Amino acid sequence: MVGGRRLGKRGSPLLRWSVKQESFSHGFSKSDLQALSSICDAIMPPVPLESLNLEMKLKVLRNDALLSFFKSSSSESHVRPDEVAELLATKAIPLTVLVVRIVLRILTFRLGTLLLCGLVCLDKKHWPFLLKFSEMSLEKREKVLQRWNTQWYNPLARIGFMMIKAIFLFYYFTWTNENSENPVWDAINYSVEIGENEDMEQKERPLDEGIIETAKEDEMTIKQRMINKGLKVTEDRERDTYKIECDAVVVGSGCGGGVAAAILAKSGLRVVVIEKGNYFAPRDYSALEGPSMFELFESNSLMMTHDGRFRFMAGSTVGGGSVVNWAASLKTPDAIIEEWSVHRGISIYSSEKYKAAMGIVCKRLGVTEKIIREGFQNQILRKGCEKLGLDVTIVPRNSTEKHYCGSCSYGCPTGEKRGTDSTWLVDAVNNNAVILTQCKAEKLILADNDANKREESGRRKRCLGVAASLSHQTRKKLQINAKVTIVACGSLKTPGLLASSGLKNSNISRGLHIHPIMMAWGYFPEKNSELEGAAHEGEIVTSLHYVHPMDSTTPNITLETPAIGPGTFAALTPWVSGSDMKERMAKYARTAHIFAMVRDEGVGEVKGDIVKYRLTKADEENLTIGLKQALRILVAAGAAEVGTYRSDGQRMKCDGIKQKDLEAFLDTVNAPPGVVSMSKHWTQSFTAHQIGCCRMGATEKEGAIDGKGESWEAEDLYVCDASVLPTALGVNPMITVQSTAYCISNRIAELMKKRKKD
């Protein structure tokens, strides 16, 4: 609802679910779909009221929507197997799709079912005494899923089940009809609310003056559109390529690329920004979790570490991560600045210019610590900390003090959060920069440096621009020739572009830090009237608590609250049984989360869609320390029940609990491995910060780029995103990334001015 009105068709069609499809391209057979449907029915079966405890039974009987929710099965719901299969086939990482295909195909055969399910598929009464999975009773299918959930020696079934469960439940709780309605939202007390903003319905979007949305163009119009924006364009018909001449090309439009584009355009350079995502303004955001996460996030928000332990949340739209982040605007800690400047010898952090840059960035983003009203989860974090005598810190944010938007992770529909799309990129466009959307950088254009240049710069190569591809609407390629090239694709994509272009530095793709997190949850029944609201309401991060390990003076662990819509909640929640799943969802709106985020020592490596990452022993210990502290805070705040995201549904009732019982429970808490592990218990979490992979180094051996942001291998090639940061920093990195980009791009601007004079 919006101000008492239904959302209806608000927002871009790309950020709403499409109407029911009649044809599909998923490639699953009818038998595969039958097996898929049978799994989904066992995940969300009808639940008899007599199986519920008294408290839940009374709650269900008082609420018609909840009663209908408990009585229904997935096959009777708004979700069709074809649609779940289509999402799996088109959105998930190919390797996981292959696993799902294999599992479903095996289950279409009787012997295959015996292989994956064991003797539970035997039927002594009917020939041939073996049942296919779809022929088994609902109770037996549920038992099979419970086994798969714990069987480390059957990784194929466990991974396949995890993926089907995640996609199915995510779609089940995020699906909407053409009026943005979902029949189960009333049951779980969820609604999509958007505050009013007088600028929300403005006709012209902030970047319209400089943006070219290539998906809306064809081969006949795209060239003229670029010329109309003032670009010098020629056509190479033999290569089916348009050649563009400019001073600077920026690949990526997020926290790093947006700042670089603004600074370089302001200095008088002709700047072209290319972005593989689409452009949306506040009026375009639907606040709908499902389609927004698939459209606005890298790899549809389904990219994971190799062990399935962490999902990556990285922006893939004009504005990048600043569009989908949670507005936390924390400056680089002094201890980190000292480490990078003194111990690692990175010159950019050793001067007062960097600290001044942080002030300039915060001013441009309108960062404030003022807040009129805290949301449900932050109230709980604050209350729990105060009860325990712990320090709680107000989080600076790049939003207004009255901002109360719980859906900023899907793009801020009120426009009160100031991402690069409404700040730095506006500055760039106002200084004649051009932004091309749905434009993907394929390769950097590198040439051998001549002998004099090589001796002068010490670099064997020179970057001359970028080769890029456009949207599916045209086969034309782009060759963007530039005097300077800035890569800002983020830590997950920048390494691949550099490596595929022929750069060989050993630090490229390595040294990834992810600020890993583990979440704790606490259920606060409605009778607790002191804590108002619901988990999905209010600004996402307004309070935090720093946990200090006994042997450290630098906070390596931070406790914050996340954005977690019903789809994400359902996808991540451990599945113990169909009844338990429905009970957890019935409590969704009053289930608060606190996560522990660690400044990790462990490092990873990015190779395409595969991210290899391992925590160190110290990281594991810090996550466990943070998770236990989060649980203590939730209990102190008055939770009736608390738990973790361990696959067995680890939890504890809190009413009347004694301290010794709490400590006994906490002794069982740890940071479990991922689904691929050889462990009975596993977990899945997410990470919103990806750092490193092209880090700065004082020497070529220590980093992929130098202390001024330039590649050690290729002259006139710079990197301006989170991948340049030398280590993890332990706090939300937006201000650090933008301030680093500010310093790098100002140096580039000065260098270009000097060249012009020479």
Curated annotation (Swiss-Prot):
Transmembrane annotation, as ranges: 102-122, 155-175
GO cellular component labels: membrane
Name of this protein: Long-chain-alcohol oxidase FAO1
UniProt membrane topology term: Multi-pass membrane protein
Domain of life according to the entry: Eukaryota
GO molecular function, a single term: long-chain-alcohol oxidase activity
Coiled-coil stretches noted in the UniProt entry, renumbered to this chain: none
Catalytic activity, reaction form: a long-chain primary fatty alcohol + O2 = a long-chain fatty aldehyde + H2O2
Keywords, ordered alphabetically: FAD, Flavoprotein, Membrane, Oxidoreductase, Transmembrane, Transmembrane helix
EC number: 1.1.3.20
Role summary: Long-chain fatty alcohol oxidase involved in the omega-oxidation pathway of lipid degradation.
Principal subcellular localization: membrane
Active site: H689
Gene behind the chain: FAO1
Compartments (UniProt record): Membrane
Top class in the EC scheme: oxidoreductase
Family the entry assigns: Belongs to the GMC oxidoreductase family.
Residues the entry annotates as binding FAD: 246-261
